């Protein structure tokens, strides 16, 4: 309507959304309306590197003027080959996407059953709300040291003060037992740290 350029960061979505893993823009039928799409070869694709997709002129401009790109080197051939195979696989297979959705739903349901507050959203990323930077870091450390569960604490300035959280992303390779172990650990730590429970 206004002729604006649109830039979409799909790093959390490629491989996971859309019938062929093209991301939210594919899932919603908007890919042809986006000026520039940024994605990653990490996360769902399990490799390293990233990309931008747009017109030839815009991509050429970025190659010439993006300070983060100008002095970089190309991906090693083995990484590029692995990424290509991964992309091809996820374009054809829905099994991984469906398995992840199942595990995301399981974790959300178990958190709800235990009264552990998390932000409701349509994403596969589940932010468990701690709302205290010291406790957020402490919980992250204890989960790693005592339970072997790695989770990154998300504190200010990444999020506003008072909204500190642990951010969980279940994968299709996490078993039901893995998710139950996580929820059991969070239940124990919630009680030990006297954190507020969600209101039903």
Task: Give residue ranges: language-model regions.
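Conserved PLP-binding catalytic core of the aspartate aminotransferase-like
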Residues: 97-108, 112-148, 156, 163, ...
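Active-site C-terminal subdomain of aminotransferase-like
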Residues: 2-5, 12, 17-122, 135
